[in-house]
Amino acid sequence: MQTQLDFWLWNSIISKTDCQKIIDRGLEQLDILQKEGFDSNATTFGDNHKTGTRSISQKDLTQQQLSENNINEKDVYIRDSRIAWLSDQWIYDLIWPWVYKSNNRSGWHYEFDYAEPAQFTIYDKDQFYGWHSDGPNDIHAVKRRKIPGVYDETHTDKALFAYADGLIGKVRKLSITLMLSDPNNYEGGNLKFDRGEHIKNRYEEISGGMVNQGSIVVFPSYKYHCVTPVTKGTRYSLVVWFNGRPMK
């Protein structure tokens, strides 16, 4: 294990057999989505949508650069990957213990009680995820249940899925990435953190050469990060967000 300013890394703690089972399950779910007419290409909000066209690939542009270049954020694809959603209990059983250990040993000590559906992600050659934060706007805290005489209807937004009732009033506290691929099977696709311009060594990059198949990276959801373009092969990963009440 290794601790850093922005993340906690557990190397090779999920077996290769279990990694392959997750990959197989994710590919199965992708096949179902495609048969139902849904596009597996991830949008900025992370959902699956009916097949459409995309315009600009953001890659390494920041929000400030988008503004300075008068690029409409709605015309930009901040990510280029394929995704499917998994809610199998056995997957959570593999992951939860390591999230708890990371939270305690790192000193973060966040309170959380809810895990969102796991996002199985495929990055093929030249695919990427630009700079972003998983929980910058308390995306679930603004949601409200329908209460007769108080709220006429449940307040939601386009990012709300069927599972979101358990997320109402909560924020993302911790994010995890489980590396499902053998690092010998792809190049690039590094998980990269931006510590801020005030830090001497501003960027921290976790490359395939640093982690083995079955490694888990845990980090606070507000941390600014990206996945660099894959230059060779295919990178499989699993992402899960852990939620709790604000300010705890």
Predicted regions, residues:
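Fe(II)/2-oxoglutarate oxygenase catalytic core
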Residues: 1-218, 222-248
